[in-house]
Each structure stands twice: as structure tokens, then as C-alpha cells.
């Protein structure tokens, strides 16, 4: 595996919000739209994605601060993709790894922990894939979010996925799961916000949840020892910014973590292929990129969000592929599982 060592400023979107809006030819008046005027503009100016009149609730609490756009790091950037990998026109790992139970949608609740939740989800998938579906474990986003501080970021305020992958190498991460999951070391500590169909209602949420404390022990009543329950990685890197490199990485090793700029129009996404069209920059978000495809001659990435399975397309969304829309292809973080630690 070849890498290029770079000392660089990693960013979640290659340009500022205003610069990207200008670069895409988005009129100034469209950049400033919110609410019903924005919804009306989106419905008449594009046909790639359907729009919700009601915006995503707790939107500001689900995304990261703008300060997580930049970080100075010495990064291992994976060089050219494997030339022997044959890239299919579409790919969905759920169809290939049908026995992997880790391919489900998480719920980060009112906490900007997307960087930890998406990384834990990608690691869980990669463990299943690396073991040929013999090992099924949900990695704890809580362990990453609460204990990888300050090097990874600041818990519910946001963080950097590449640092979470590095934490997986050097500290290891225990088993986890969704809120109140039994028989795991450290399940997610924050309950889902509001009503979600027939799911258990735990209550509403107000503001951004405080980051829970780091506890280097398993929850009471679980017959697991924290240190023994750890799983480890053996490599962490940024994937080269090219469509083929990203596709090759996903095919070979499993889902990756993508970070992108979130604009006001994403708040109203309902279904279809998202492309930034209007609205101001609101923050940044990290998600699990699992595959790709094409619909009506539009290439897209297939992405798992962490806003419950009643958001978007059953918890997933698609975004245009090949144009680095919102910086989605610019900072792809990934890593290799140490199978001996499983």
C-alpha cells in the first residue's frame, strides 16, 4: 500500500461557503434564502431531489461547528487506487454482505457526534467485511466521542474522523450500540429526540447535549472487561481525492467516512440526489459513504446518515458524484482493521 506523507491543512470543504456558492453560480439572493422562500426556490430551480416543507428538527444540534472545517495534521494520504480493481457502474455493500448486521442507520440525537458515530459505523462494517462476516460487532461511538479528547475534537461539539481512525489504532475501541443496547460495553448515552413512528418515545431534546464523561469501564451489569473488549486498527489514512480512488477503497475494504459542508438547503432534503442549490453555510457533517450508482444519467454517492431511519431515504441520502459537491470527495477518512484483535 503506497502513501504520500503530507503536512497540510485538512478541510471539510475546499472553499468557504460564499466562495463555493459563487463558484457554482448560485445567485446572491438564492444564497440568503431560508424557510418557505427557499423551499419554493428549490422546487422550481432543480429536479434532482425532493424537498420537505418542514425542515429537519434539531438541525443545528446534529451538525458540527464551522471551526471543524480546518485542522493541521501530518496525514497519510493513500496514493493511486489499485489498477486491478474493476469498478462496477453501481455498488451497494448491503447486497454483497447480506449477513453483516452492522449495516443499519444510527441516531446521534442532539449531539454533534457525527464524526464519532460515522467512524464507529464504518469500522463495524469493515470488521464484518474483513472477517468474511464471521465477526459481528458494533463499535462504540461513545468510547470514541468521550475518550478521544482533545486530540479528536470536543465530543458533541464536533471532531475529526481521521483522528477517530487513529484512536482506533493506538487506543482501541470497545463494543457499543444504540441507546440502551444490552450486552455491550458502552452503548450510545443520548436518547433519540422526539417521535419516530412506532419506536419508543424517550422525550424531546433541548439544545446540544453535553458531552458525557469518559469512562474506561463497561456499563454496570455487563460481563465484559473494558480493556479486553477493545478492538484495534492497524492503519489510518485519507483517501486520494478522486472518484476512482474512493470507489476502489470502498470495494476493497468497505465503507469510508466523508465530511462535507452543510448548507441551508440540506435541511429540507427529502429524497433523490442532493446537489447544493441555495442557502447559506450552516456547519459541517461527517457521514458513512457506502457505495454509488446512477439515476437518470446523474452519478451519485450512496451515503448513510445518522439522523434516524425516518430521515431522508430510510436514513440514507444520495449526493451528486464527481464534482466534489460541498467537499464530499475532499476529505475521505478510512483505516484497516487489525483482524488479530477481533
Curated annotation (Swiss-Prot):
Signal peptide span: 1-18
Disulfide topology: 100-128, 111-156, 147-214, 148-152, 185-218, 193-205
Keywords: Disulfide bond, Glycoprotein, Hydrolase, Protease, Signal, Thiol protease, Zymogen
Prosequence residues removed at maturation: 19-86
UniProt xrefs under InterPro entries: Papain-like_cys_pep_sf (IPR038765), Pept_asp_AS (IPR025661), Pept_cys_AS (IPR000169), Pept_his_AS (IPR025660), Peptidase_C1A (IPR013128), Peptidase_C1A_C (IPR000668)
SUPFAM superfamilies: Cysteine proteinases
Active site, renumbered: 114, 285, 305
Pfam families reported in the protein's UniProt record: Peptidase_C1 (PF00112)
GO biological process: proteolysis
Domain of life according to the entry: Eukaryota
GO molecular function: cysteine-type peptidase activity
Protein EC: 3.4.22.-
Glycosylated residue positions: 99, 138, 198, 296
Enzyme kind, highest EC tier: hydrolase
UniProt similarity note: Belongs to the peptidase C1 family.
Function according to Swiss-Prot or TrEMBL: Expression of the protease correlates with blood-feeding and suggests a role for the protease in blood digestion.
Protein name per Swiss-Prot or TrEMBL: Cathepsin B-like cysteine proteinase 2
Lineage: Eukaryota, Metazoa, Ecdysozoa, Nematoda, Chromadorea
Gene it is expressed from: AC-2
